[in-house]
UniProtKB/Swiss-Prot annotation:
Xref: CDD domains: HAD_EP (cd01629)
Any Gene Ontology biological process: L-methionine salvage from methylthioadenosine
Pathway: Amino-acid biosynthesis; L-methionine biosynthesis via salvage pathway; L-methionine from S-methyl-5-thio-alpha-D-ribose 1-phosphate: step 3/6; Amino-acid biosynthesis; L-methionine biosynthesis via salvage pathway; L-methionine from S-methyl-5-thio-alpha-D-ribose 1-phosphate: step 4/6
Domain of life according to the entry: Bacteria
UniProt feature coiled coil, ranges: none
HAMAP family linked: Salvage_MtnC
NCBIfam families on file: enolase-ppase
Subunit structure: Monomer.
Name the record gives this protein: Enolase-phosphatase E1
E.C. number: 3.1.3.77
Length: 242
């Protein structure tokens, strides 16, 4: 019996185009100004320090080449860090520090009314129905928890953060690693077999299934993956029968 549902965001509850064509470009436009600000807040400084630590431990050859060219390898300048972030963005590299910084920038954009998150029309009705059934709802996304909560706090359907009781990001572990889903099940306090994971990424579904979770592969118009493999396919959350 399913007692909890863990939802991906991009391509599952929110169109992939919002993330790729709105959120990421917005963060990139604000990145230099945010990093180079003389009066940057402490959370930005913390994200930058985390990025430097990640950079020094990044084994990728281009990352190390950039570090060697930095004016001070022990304490890269703001300009050096921007070059590193540009490299991560251009190559779609996953970075917890970059995600944190993007989340800070998006928070400013949401607060200013420059950003609003579109949801698929079936999402809120499904969340409401599951909540009424006593199902625990959680989020697992590669975006930071801050970014997740901002997205759901500023949707076209209003603030729906109260529908979710737990939030997970890459600090829990990689989404393609089965151990990450085992950690999530432990955090929720349920056996994996009692948890349903929904995502538009077949390999994420593979990892969740390996951990023992039930899975649904979500195929939406415009999603990058169309083959869900052995996972049961849905086209909207209303198709999920518990």
């Amino acid at each position: 019996m399913i007692k909890a549902i863990v939802l991906d965001i991009e391509g599952t509850t929110c169109p992939v185009t919002f993330v790729s064509q709105t959120l990421f470009p917005f963060a990139r436009r604000q990145l230099s100004k945010t990093i180079c600000s003389e009066n940057r807040p402490s959370n930005v400084t913390a994200a930058i320090e985390e990025a430097i630590a990640e950079w020094k431990n990044d084994p990728e050859s281009k990352s190390q080449a950039l570090l060697l060219r930095a004016s001070n390898q022990n304490q890269p300048t703001s300009e050096d860090i921007i070059h590193y972030f540009d490299h991560l963005i251009q190559n779609d590299r996953k970075s917890t520090a970059l995600k944190e910084l993007q989340g800070i920038i998006w928070e400013q954009g949401y607060a200013a009314g420059e950003l609003q998150s579109p949801l698929y029309g079936d999402v809120v009705p499904a969340l409401n129905a599951w909540t009424q059934q006593g199902i625990t709802l959680a989020v697992y996304s590669s975006g930071s928890v801050k970014a997740q909560q901002l997205l759901y706090a500023h949707t076209t359907d209003g603030d729906i953060t109260n529908r979710f009781s737990q939030w997970f990001d890459t600090r829990t572990g990689p989404k393609l690693n089965a151990d990450s889903y085992r950690i999530i099940s432990q955090s929720i306090g349920l056996k994996p077999a009692s948890i349903l994971f929904v995502s538009d990424h077949p390999r994420e579904c593979d990892a969740a299934a390996e951990a023992g979770m039930e899975t649904r592969f979500c195929l939406r118009e415009g999603n990058p993956f169309s083959d869900g493999g052995d996972h049961q396919m849905i086209h909207n959350l209303g198709e999920i029968k518990l």
